[in-house]
Amino acid sequence: MDQEKVLKEFEKAGALLRGHFILSSGLHSPVFLQKALVFMNPQRTGRLCKALAEKIRQEVKGPIDAIVSPAVGGIIPGYETARYMKVPAMYVEREQGEFVLRRGFPLTKGMRVVMVEDIVTTGLSSRECIEAIGKTGAKVVAAACLIDRSGGKAKVGTKLISLARIAIPAYAPDKLPKELAALPAEKPGSRHIA
């Protein structure tokens, strides 16, 4: 699946939103990718994650023992990608502000893992997830996401495989363009939800 088809899936789902958004990273953007609208359709999610699984297989040499994703946003694409790769799907979740592996997931030393995310902006959640995986002794052989909205600038600490790599502007709160600052800000992301 090429980049244009990936973005078309988001457009068909009504998931390519325009306005003024505060992203989970704290940055502000005129575009928000509301992946929940994509993930509510199992067929659409399946198409995207099957394509991601195929791309991971092409780019990662050697066996893959598991897919691990950060909660909340990475759980669905991680699970679906793992299903197509026929490996276990696990996730890390926040406990006292840090990602940890819980629920008895059997991630152990020496396992070869791909970390799967939904959307990457700054790479912070990916880096935190990879750090949590590393604490188990497992080896992260790659990271993957549906869309890298940093245009390839995000650093996650390992190779980042994406179905689409686009540069969507994101601004620090004190560096907003006038036209964006004039719009009311919405915060549709999932980080810090109480």
From Swiss-Prot:
Its cofactor is Mg(2+). Transmembrane segments: none annotated. Its EC number is 2.4.2.10. InterPro entries: OPRT, Orotate_PRibTrfase_bac, PRibTrfase_dom, PRTase-like. Pathway: Pyrimidine metabolism; UMP biosynthesis via de novo pathway; UMP from orotate: step 1/2. Homodimer. Catalyzes the transfer of a ribosyl phosphate group from 5-phosphoribose 1-diphosphate to orotate, leading to the formation of orotidine monophosphate (OMP). This is Orotate phosphoribosyltransferase. It comes from Parvibaculum lavamentivorans (strain DS-1 / DSM 13023 / NCIMB 13966).
